[in-house]
From Swiss-Prot:
EC number of the protein: 3.5.1.26
Catalytic site: 243 (nucleophile)
Post-translational modification summary for this protein: Cleaved into an alpha and beta chain by autocatalysis; this activates the enzyme. The N-terminal residue of the beta subunit is responsible for the nucleophile hydrolase activity.
Domain of life: Eukaryota
Organism lineage: Eukaryota, Metazoa, Ecdysozoa, Arthropoda, Hexapoda
Name of the protein this chain belongs to: Putative N(4)-(beta-N-acetylglucosaminyl)-L-asparaginase GM21137
UniProt keyword annotation of Flavoprotein present: no
Assembly and interaction partners: Heterotetramer of two alpha and two beta chains arranged as a dimer of alpha/beta heterodimers.
Length: 393
C-alpha cells in the first residue's frame, strides 16, 4: 500500500512539474530582437525592441530614393512574407532608379566620363547561394541591374565588363541605345570648357590642374609618393557619386542585395568603382545579414566595407556598430573621402553610419512602420572632431 502511495505521489509531482513548465512556455513573452539605439557619432539603429513579425519582410536602400523603395516594397508584398520575391524586389527597385536617373548618378544620362560617355555598373547578390551577377563599364545598355541579373542566372561567371558585357546583353535581348542625353552632353561641354577641371589624373604632364591633356607619365621621386596620395584635387560629394544600394529580406530570412550607379563624374574611361564589386558595393549572407555602401568608390573598394560590416555582425556586433566598423577601417588609412554604409542583420535590425557629410538619408519599408511602412530616416555623420583617434580593427 505504501509503495503504491509513493508511486502515486511521484506521478503527481511529475505532472505538476510538467504543467508548470508548459505554463511558463505558453505565458512567456514573444522573443524580441535587441536593437538598442547607438549613441556613437555617425550611427543609427532601430530604436526599440521589435519582434520578427514587426521587422520582416523589409526593404532598405541608400539615399532618399523613395520611388525605388516603394516599388520594391510593393513587389515584396506580392507574396506572404515576401517569400521568393527578394530578388525581384531588389532588381526592380534599382531598375526604377535607373529609369528615373536618380540624382543623375544612377542610370543613363549622368556622370559623363572624360569622353562624354555614360557607362553603368551594377550587381545582384544572393545571400542563400552566395552567387553574384555583376556588370561594369556597361556601354549603350540602359538596364544595368537587369543585365547583372542575367549574368547571375544565365552564366557561371560573377562579372562581365565593357563592350563584351554589352554584347552579352544584346544576346540576352537587351537593345543598344545611347546613354548620352542633352543634359549629360552639356555637363561634359562645360567641364571641357573649364580646362577639364577637376579630374582624376596625377603624376602626368602637362599639368592636369590646368589642362585637358592628352597626358604622359611624369617620373615621380620616391619622396613624393606620400604627397601624391592626397585627394584634394577632386572632392567626391553628395551629388557627384551616389549609388543606389538596396537590401530585401523575407520572413524566412532570405536576403538579396543589389547596387546600380553610373560612377564618378568625369572619370577616366575604363574606371570601375565599388558598386559592382562583391564585398565593396554590397554583400549578403543569409546566415548573418547584408550591407550596402555608397560614396567615394575608388577609396571604399580597397577596404571591402560591406564585407567588413557583415563579418562584424557575424562576430556579434549590432548593425549600427558593424556599419561604423566598416568605415573605421577606411578612416585608419584615408580621411579625405565621403561614404556611408547600411547594415542589416538577418532578423531585420538595421543601422547606418556615414562620414564626410552632415547627414545621410536612407529609405526603409517594413511592418514596423505600421500605418507608414515606407519611411525616410537619417543619420548624422561622424563630425570633424570624431576624425581623430580612429582605432585599428
Amino acid at each position: 500500500m505504501r509503495t503504491h502511495l509513493r508511486a502515486s505521489l511521484w506521478v503527481l509531482c511529475l505532472a505538476s512539474t510538467a504543467f508548470s513548465i508548459l505554463a511558463a512556455v505558453n505565458t512567456s513573452p514573444k522573443p524580441t530582437l535587441a536593437s538598442a539605439f547607438s549613441g556613437k557619432a555617425g550611427t543609427t539603429a532601430v530604436k526599440a525592441n521589435k519582434t520578427t513579425d514587426e521587422l520582416l519582410p523589409m526593404v532598405i536602400n541608400t539615399w532618399n530614393f523613395t520611388a525605388a523603395n516603394v516599388l520594391a516594397w510593393r513587389i515584396l508584398k506580392q507574396s506572404k512574407g515576401g517569400l521568393r520575391q527578394t530578388r525581384n524586389a531588389v532588381v526592380e527597385g534599382c531598375s526604377k532608379c535607373e529609369k528615373l536617373q536618380c540624382d543623375r548618378t544612377v542610370g543613363y544620362g549622368g556622370s559623363p566620363d572624360e569622353l562624354g560617355e555614360t557607362t553603368l555598373d551594377a550587381m545582384v547578390m544572393d545571400g542563400a547561394t552566395m552567387d553574384v551577377g555583376a556588370v561594369a563599364g556597361l556601354r549603350r545598355i540602359k538596364d544595368a541591374i537587369k543585365v547583372a541579373r542575367h549574368v547571375l542566372e544565365h552564366t557561371q561567371h560573377t562579372m562581365l565588363v565593357g563592350d563584351a558585357a554589352s554584347a552579352f546583353a544584346n544576346a540576352m535581348g537587351f537593345e543598344s541605345e545611347s546613354l548620352v542625353t542633352p543634359e549629360s552632353k552639356d555637363m561634359w561641354l562645360q567641364w571641357t570648357a573649364e580646362n577639364c577641371q577637376p579630374n582624376f589624373w596625377k603624376n602626368v604632364h602637362p599639368d592636369p590642374k590646368v589642362s585637358c591633356g592628352p597626358y604622359k607619365p611624369r617620373p615621380t621621386p620616391l619622396t613624393r609618393w606620400k604627397e601624391d596620395r592626397a585627394r584634394n584635387e577632386y572632392e567626391i560629394g553628395r551629388k557627384n557619386h551616389d549609388t543606389i544600394g538596396m537590401i530585401a529580406i523575407d520572413v524566412e530570412n532570405n536576403i538579396h542585395a543589389g547596387t546600380s550607379t553610373n560612377g564618378a563624374n568625369h572619370k577616366i574611361p575604363g574606371r570601375v568603382g565599388d558598386s559592382p564589386i562583391p564585398g565593396a558595393g554590397a554583400y549578403a549572407d543569409n546566415e548573418v545579414g547584408a550591407a550596402v555602401a555608397t560614396g567615394d568608390g575608388d577609396v571604399m573598394m580597397r577596404f571591402l566595407p560591406s564585407l567588413l560590416a557583415v563579418e562584424a555582425m557575424r562576430a556579434g556586433k549590432p548593425p549600427a556598430e558593424a556599419a561604423q566598423k566598416g568605415l573605421r577601417r577606411i578612416l585608419k588609412h584615408q580621411k579625405d573621402f565621403m561614404g556611408a554604409l547600411i547594415a542589416v542583420d538577418r532578423l531585420g535590425n538595421y543601422g547606418a553610419a556615414c562620414y564626410g557629410l552632415a547627414e545621410f538619408p536612407f529609405m526603409v519599408s517594413s511592418p514596423a512602420g505600421a500605418d507608414r511602412p515606407t519611411r525616410l530616416e537619417t543619420v548624422k555623420c561622424i563630425a570633424g572632431q570624431d576624425k581623430v583617434n580612429i582605432v585599428a580593427l
